[in-house]
Amino acid sequence: MVKKVFSFVWLITMAGTAAAEEAPDTIGRELDEVVVSGTAARQRLGDVRPGTERLELSTLKQLPSFGGENDIIRSLTLLPGVRSEGDGGGGFEVRGGSASQNLVLVDGITLYNPAHVMGIFSTFNDDALSSATLFKGAVPAMYGGASSSVLATQLAPGDMESYHGSFTVGLLAAKLKAEGPVVKDKLSFAVAARRSYVDAFLKMIPQYRSTVMNFYDVTARLRFIPSERNIVDGTFFISHDNMAVGNLMGMYWGNIGGSLNWLARSSDSFSVTSTLALTHFEPKMEMDIMDDDQVMRTYIHNYSLNERFRLALTDDHGLELGLRSELLRVRSAEWAQGASFEREIRSLWQNALWADYAGRFGEHFDVDLGVRLSVATVPTGRHFHDFHSNEGLQADFSGKTYFDVEPRAALKYALTSLHSIKAGVGMSTQNLHAIRSGMTSFPFDRYALTSASVKPEKSLQYSLGYAGMTYDGGFDWSAEVYYRDIDNVYDFKDGRSTFSDIMLENIILGGRGRSYGLELMARKNIGRLTGWISYTLSHTQTKIAGINDGRWYDATNDRRHDVTVTAIYRLSDSWSFSGSWIYLSGQPLTAPDVKYEIAGETCYYYSRRNAYLTPSTHRLDLSATYTHTGARFTYQWSFGLYNAYCRYNPTVVYFEDDPSKPSGTRAVQQSMYGLIPSVSYTLKF
């Protein structure tokens, strides 16, 4: 089943290519592009938390775009310790973690599988964003539920004084943005929408006229300022993908969410932020094979309430306290085939209290100390667990409560005004598990909630780093080492995959994981030519009793070497050029050791998990941008080459018979993208 799905994705994609917290008083900011040049060198040096990346706004096109889209996720992968899942995967992986171990937030709304059309675009419309911060090391105590990293993004509020807008038309998609006041200085709006039209090109090719591949997303934000000490924000987000080949197969998924945020200041030193948020993520797959209809559905429903209290004790010391209550309801699997119907739905209630203290002691020493107390309750009864199977299977729905204490700490010592040392330690707990059987994450991965038998995933990470810069900030550099130990990592049993059994506990096993590495980065910040070079050396392993004879084995997402080189050249006020080169060493792969025949069918025997490597991945992206700024209008032309030297990187590797080989078997690589040119036109008014 999984092989058919990957084959379908590869088919339609090849067809297509052939043809940190927003400042409360920030009002009316306009985003022209999100870039990962990082913060100013001085601010990077002064950040207390190691492994923190703040993505800045810029009015200049700087990084190569894909199809005319400046993508946050793709930009993140140019940083050390962060990498893409590869072609066909829309997620990002941080310090050996999988994409499902990241917490991705938009104005407090949790997003799942934040990707369009199998990773061609992310669900982030850059026109709508105001700011973004990635925590890959010491995560603040206010964030929980993710064992790897946190990406916190905020949408830009509408201008309270005047109306603005823009639209962009590219080869693959178009987008529109509008913002302005509803009631001047009191109520504003900002709306951004995007829609792809890959289908139009597919219909020009006779053999792909019945193929559907499109997506859309809409973001909207209202800001209301009833008084000088109160701000109320309402956010709405929806994204949806459609992929199908006639009546043979269809895949659909998307997020829909909303949040209401109220910031109240009782004084200049004390404020309270209340946030109510919800998310619905619902993938669906349909297949019609020889008149045999098959339907597979899953969903994740997330409802949360957050309270955050901030108190400035002095100019150099501050305290934050908060609480969070969250209800998760997950349909791990539901599929129907003919008269057969099976379904599994589970629920989990999470509550947390947290505290965070930040202080400065003299000119050299800064500290951030936090703790998070989390309680995960697995409720009992049919109201919280819905299980149905034609096979008459029974499940143990006994309840259980887990208590966890998650300490967090970050320290910075300034050796001089130009050099600093940072250290961090943090524990995180995750109760939503995604178990994948492919090389990348997938909208139809099996999701499991912590239960009486599936334990919470617990991560403990240590990090130590050094940062330095030149006196004028023209150059800065950093080095960081980390070690992460994880308990209760889950993987499929040998011979099992996503759709092997409706009862997830029957097909998975739990164990330990570990990841450690070195991250290096050097940047040039001044002059016509700017850019950065990053290198990551890392190793990620898993050890599970019952898999690989209980020995450590390389995790599916282990990539030993990761190199990125990014250059930006500003020829004039109108023209700028950029390029980025990315290299990733091979990905672990499970290959057969022996094959045999049963009733004329070839069967393979796998003795070791992930003992082989796929070929390495590398590509070069190039772009050129022309910008004209007028009195009332600004327009921009962007030209790009994705994968400029047309390297076919592996997306799926499988094995088949080949009598010409001494082993009688050969590995077959399928790739998604070759050289993809792009052009887009943007008008701002």
What do these predicted regions represent?
Residues 325-420, 431-432, 547-550:
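Signature of Gram-negative outer-membrane beta-barrel scaffolds
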